Amino acid sequence: MNIKPKKYKPIKEEYIKSFKDMLLLRRFEEKCGQLYGMGEIGGFCHLYIGQEAVISAVELIKKKGDSTITSYRDHAHIILAGTEPKYVLAELMGRATGCSKGKGGSMHLFDIPNKFYGGHGIVGAQVPIGTGLAFAEKYNGTNNICFTFLGDGAVNQGQVYEAFNMASLWGLPVVYIIENNEYSMGTSVSRSTFMRDLYKKGESFGIRGFQLDGMDFEEMYNGTKQVAEYVRENSFPVILEVKTYRYRGHSMSDPAKYRSKEEVAKYKERDTLVRIRQIILDNKYATEEDLKAIERSVQEVIKVAVEFSENSPLPSEDELYTDIYV
């Protein structure tokens, strides 16, 4: 297969939905950063600010029954998978009402009813699991696929290639999405891997790979839709490398001194949220007042999430002895 340029384009309703989704993710992550600074969120906290177009486009393409798994930068993925933001924020704040009962925190978010399987803190560990999820779909004879997200740093992990080999050997319906935000923690791609075209990493296993502009919502939508169709019809893996960028540090404790202000500013000029907003206005899909109303509704969701989390109890001591399997 080859990705055809502009074969698919979002319709009006999809543009508006994705604008609302991206805005919700942006405001949610900004609030998380604020609460972390206030000491309301502890431990590790990895924000997704700047990368919103990637998951927003994928969620439009996903069909009911498809599954998602990702790394520790997972707030956006679980929210768009269907988990209410208040349960995600409660988890970040260590409350019993959180999606992982307050025991997982930022890096270990789960929502099995919505087929979101984590949230994994070990770099690359989710890739073999995502491959296993795809195996289950094939074994059970469904037409579902698994979207397995990983970062550019995870591509250097050995288990990733073991998973690639099994996925191609058994013909598994999995889309590996490499969110290449240029840095593995503080190490640039150019310093961490010899072959910088990460979408080619599956060639030895017969896996086709494609590179998309993760800052371009329309390109993400078009490319992901074609790839998902191929994987669903042929039950064979594909790798998507999406070139994106995080505006904040690797985590909240990272001042990101390894990159210049000019570099960050260059990427912010292509801010996906600003661009999709302008597309909507230029095509008269919505008015300025319509978009302001969406902003107000998003702010209300964030307000409710904060109030819910602050008023939720901490887990009881008995929870120390539940959900233990080894």
From Swiss-Prot:
One Gene Ontology MF term: pyruvate dehydrogenase (acetyl-transferring) activity
Record bears the keyword Oxidoreductase: yes
Uppermost EC category: oxidoreductase
Assigned GO CC terms: intracellular membrane-bounded organelle
EC number: 1.2.4.1
Stored InterPro entries: DH_E1, PDH_E1_Alpha_Subunit, Pyrv_DH_E1_asu_subgrp-y, THDP-binding
Recorded catalytic activity of this chain's protein: N(6)-[(R)-lipoyl]-L-lysyl-[protein] + pyruvate + H(+) = N(6)-[(R)-S(8)-acetyldihydrolipoyl]-L-lysyl-[protein] + CO2
Known cofactor(s): thiamine diphosphate
One GO process term, biological-process aspect: pyruvate decarboxylation to acetyl-CoA
Keywords on record: Oxidoreductase, Pyruvate, Thiamine pyrophosphate
UniProt keyword Oxidoreductase, yes or no: yes
CDD domains per UniProt: TPP_E1_PDC_ADC_BCADC
PANTHER family, A to Z: PYRUVATE DEHYDROGENASE E1 COMPONENT SUBUNIT ALPHA, PYRUVATE DEHYDROGENASE E1 COMPONENT, ALPHA SUBUNIT BACTERIAL AND ORGANELLAR
Function: The pyruvate dehydrogenase complex catalyzes the overall conversion of pyruvate to acetyl-CoA and CO(2). It contains multiple copies of three enzymatic components: pyruvate dehydrogenase (E1), dihydrolipoamide acetyltransferase (E2) and lipoamide dehydrogenase (E3).
Subunit structure: Heterodimer of an alpha and a beta chain.
Name of the protein in its database record: Pyruvate dehydrogenase E1 component subunit alpha
Species, as recorded: Rickettsia typhi (strain ATCC VR-144 / Wilmington)
